[in-house]
Amino acid sequence: MLKNKLAPTKETIEIFLLEDDPIFSQLFSKNLKKAFQKNGQNLSIRCFTNCIEAIAALPDGCKPPDLFILDVLLIGPDGFTFLNEIASYPDLSKIPVIIVSSLKFPDQTYESYNVVDILNKTTMTPQALFSAVVKALKRDFEV
């Protein structure tokens, strides 16, 4: 278990979670909020079941989310469509992405999409997801 101290801030970290399975969406949200609260951090998670909703919710000229957590198998356009869409906007293309999927990915890099981690949805633990989020946000938290 990693133990890094974090001074609480008033800043709210915003995550866009694209997941079409409501059980996984609720599980991811609940576990992340609990872990962030334990560290004195404010966390806002906006959940979307498809790419169209998420793209429509991206702020125009406002502060974008700090992180995308993305399942690639979604209803309608898939997660790769979302990655291509955000890659076409300079301000959005810099936002880190964590892919959470039951698919196996080839040994290739997705750095051009700013994918910082790929987690297996069926075997990952809440701690693994939290650690990946902390790493993606480049912050020190207690895991």
Locations of regions flagged by a protein language model:
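Non-catalytic signal-transmission and effector/linker regions of two-component phosphorelay proteins
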Residues: M1-F16, P22-N42, P64, M124-V143
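Acidic, metal-coordinating helix/loop segments flanking the phosphotransfer/catalytic sites
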Residues: I45-L67, A128
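Acidic catalytic/metal-coordinating carboxylates
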Residues: N50, D78-T81
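Short amphipathic alpha-helix used as the core "switch/output" element in two-component signaling
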Residues: A56, F80-S93
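Alpha4 helix (beta4-alpha4-beta5 surface) of REC/receiver domains from two-component response regulators
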Residues: T81, S102-S131, K135
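A short, hydrophobic beta-strand element within the central beta-sheet of small alpha/beta folds
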Residues: S93-F105
